[in-house]
Amino acid sequence: MSKGILKVLQPEGWAPAKGYANGIAARGEMIFVAGMIGWNSQCQFETDDFVAQCKQALQNIVATLACAGAGPEHMARMTWYVKDKKEYVSRGRELGKVYQEVMGKNYPAMTLVQVADLVEDRALVEIEVTAVKP
């Protein structure tokens, strides 16, 4: 499958990835978005809810991509750092809806890592993105 400058890499015979791509080939201008957490534009947390913080972090990514004239459709790689993988898994459906609401049906190569802690004490998730635009 190809979406312009991004080509999804799907090895022959593999089951389709659900909610992410196994790999992405990209060409164009690279954009690196630092790890975004679930606080607002004034660096204030409005919630301690995991899914709500994920939504805010995703919105922060979209806002940062827009500064480069890019959007979710340009994402090639996304890395999630979460404090509690069990909450991530148990709230997967809810999180999937929030993801599609903010990012649409754009699924980059994705990794999720559980970490012992994040720099900001109230942060429950941190997400970084690499994007490529023509």
Predicted regions located by residue number:
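N-terminal presequence-like segments and the immediate start of the first folded domain
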Residues: 1-76, 82-134
